[in-house]
């Protein structure tokens, strides 16, 4: 839906040299369309004022910037100085797009692991319950099942509001949204109204950005102090979650969830059983108990299901309906996806686990389902937190019977150096198999597996590429695994 608004409506307290109608607010000069206002602020490597000429060429009708301008960058005579512009962008975008987050029931999900699964499972559940639901996160934006990639877990503040408006205009009545620590720290969700905030867990990740776990946790906690928030769903099996729960605003409806019988939990899983068919447990919501039989794999998916249950309860869905819909939820692409497992082929699981905690959870969960060996294919991303590399090696060595180290988006970093960092975490490095070619590593793992083994391919999940030296090459773990499984499935024997 096309929009237009007078600049004076967006900046009523700013003296404008002349008023103009603007049809959009854009920070990227490359995506400016005729009629847009170009917002020139400091980026990570450059200032927007250096790209005014390109924005003008693309049809920008106004240029806004935050003073003072950097030394050496000319300021166009008709550019409009807006003090505190960066901090105002959320409110401006919210107003321009007609306050989209207020028109839908908004659930924000934050945490190190489980954001994507929780968002997708929640959107799936609400859709099954008859509420058209949009998603915004790692897997893209769109109504459930029709998401288109954005390239961000949480986009920048201007596109975030534009995408929420898009979801509203497409008919979404609710939105499940991933809210990363970067987004909270950088103001990407400024002026987004959330009804429910969900916390999954806090483990090591993004310390290349936050520096310390305390700062990382503080960024996550910002989601739970937002004005207008009605309910908080918090994992009480997580240490930081318990701290967050204890320090909550007393006027906030707080829903603690636990699969480990925490006393303060109002939503819990009891009598938990995992088998080759999935997960079985009794869902207890404030004393009302209903059975759940889920086809999902992995102990950590119990936590994801409980987070979904807590969010649904916060949205006033009845416990019996919640239990029924939890049993209907299907796996999310790239999250504990199953391949093989029949006709003589091993069970192969593709998962996004790319942090020490996520890898440990994936392996320990699959151990509960395994009849024989557990084979793990994993790597570590280049130009990211190097401290987690030896940690992931130690976890793979402890929890898997066979560990195969391979490439996982080396980016601009030397792949051999990444592998060397990983190998330092093995007590017996000679026992690890190194095969940097990821496709070859997947084929090797499946070739060595018996029908009673499980192969975990960890790290990339839904990603359709392998990034090497700044170039994203088409690559999909699930497709490669399916190709490797084909001879086993057809012949019923090890190739």
UniProtKB/Swiss-Prot annotation:
Pathway: Cell wall biogenesis; peptidoglycan biosynthesis. Meso-2,6-diaminopimelate binds at residues 384, 408-411, 459, 463. SUPFAM superfamilies: MurD-like peptide ligases, catalytic domain, MurD-like peptide ligases, peptide-binding domain, MurE/MurF N-terminal domain. GO terms for cellular component: cytoplasm. It catalyses: UDP-N-acetyl-alpha-D-muramoyl-L-alanyl-D-glutamate + meso-2,6-diaminopimelate + ATP = UDP-N-acetyl-alpha-D-muramoyl-L-alanyl-gamma-D-glutamyl-meso-2,6-diaminopimelate + ADP + phosphate + H(+). It is an enzyme of class 6 (ligase). Keywords: ATP-binding, Cell cycle, Cell division, Cell shape, Cell wall biogenesis/degradation, Cytoplasm, Ligase, Magnesium, Nucleotide-binding, Peptidoglycan synthesis. A motif (Meso-diaminopimelate recognition motif) lies at residues 408-411. Belongs to the MurCDEF family. MurE subfamily. NCBIfam families: murE, PRK00139.1-2, PRK00139.1-4. This is UDP-N-acetylmuramoyl-L-alanyl-D-glutamate--2,6-diaminopimelate ligase. It comes from Xanthomonas oryzae pv. oryzae (strain KACC10331 / KXO85). The gene is murE.
């Amino acid at each position: 839906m096309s929009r237009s608004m007078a600049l004076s409506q967006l900046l009523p307290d700013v003296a404008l040299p002349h008023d103009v109608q603007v049809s959009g607010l854009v920070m990227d000069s490359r995506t400016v369309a005729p009629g847009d206002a170009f917002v020139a602020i400091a980026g990570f490597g450059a200032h927007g004022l250096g790209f005014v000429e390109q924005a003008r060429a693309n049809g920008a009708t106004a240029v806004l910037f935050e003073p003072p301008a950097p030394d050496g960058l000319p300021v166009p005579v008709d550019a409009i100085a807006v003090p505190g512009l960066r901090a105002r962008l959320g409110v401006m975008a919210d107003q321009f797009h007609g306050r989209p987050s207020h028109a839908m029931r908004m659930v924000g999900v934050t945490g190190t692991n489980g954001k994507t699964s929780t968002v997708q499972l929640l959107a799936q559940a609400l859709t099954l319950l008859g509420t058209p639901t949009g998603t915004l996160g790692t897997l893209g934006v769109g109504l459930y099942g029709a998401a288109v990639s954005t390239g961000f877990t949480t986009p920048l503040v201007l596109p975030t509001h534009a995408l929420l408006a898009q979801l509203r205009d497409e008919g979404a009545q609710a939105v499940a949204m991933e809210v990363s620590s970067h987004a909270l720290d950088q103001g990407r969700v400024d002026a987004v109204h959330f009804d429910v905030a969900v916390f999954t867990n806090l483990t090591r990740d993004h310390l290349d950005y936050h520096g310390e776990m305390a700062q990382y946790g503080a960024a996550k906690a910002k989601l739970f102090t937002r004005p207008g928030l009605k309910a908080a769903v918090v994992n009480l099996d997580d240490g930081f979650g318990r701290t967050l729960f204890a320090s909550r605003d007393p006027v906030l409806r707080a829903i603690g969830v636990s699969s480990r019988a925490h006393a303060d939990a109002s939503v819990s899983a009891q009598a938990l059983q995992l088998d080759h068919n999935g997960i079985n447990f009794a869902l207890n919501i404030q004393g009302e108990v209903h059975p759940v039989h889920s086809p999902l794999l992995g102990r950590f998916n119990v936590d994801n299901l409980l987070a979904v249950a807590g969010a649904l309860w916060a949205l006033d869905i009845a416990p019996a309906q919640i239990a029924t819909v939890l049993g209907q939820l299907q796996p999310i692409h790239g999250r504990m996806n199953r391949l093989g497992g029949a006709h003589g082929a091993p069970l192969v699981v593709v998962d996004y686990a790319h942090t020490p905690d996520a890898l440990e959870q994936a392996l320990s969960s699959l151990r509960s389902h395994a009849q024989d060996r557990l084979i793990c294919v994993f790597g570590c991303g280049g130009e990211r937190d190097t401290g987690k590399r030896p940690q992931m090696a130690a976890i793979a060595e402890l929890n898997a019977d066979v560990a195969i180290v391979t490439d996982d988006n080396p980016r601009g970093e030397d792949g051999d150096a990444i592998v060397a960092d990983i190998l330092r975490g093995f007590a017996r490095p000679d026992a690890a198999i190194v095969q940097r070619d990821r496709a070859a590593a997947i084929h090797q793992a499946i070739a060595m597996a018996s029908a009673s083994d499980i192969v975990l391919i960890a790290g990339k999940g839904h990603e359709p590429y392998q990034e090497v030296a700044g170039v994203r090459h088409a690559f999909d773990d699930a497709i490669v695994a399916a190709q490797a499984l084909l001879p086993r499935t057809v012949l019923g024997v090890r190739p």
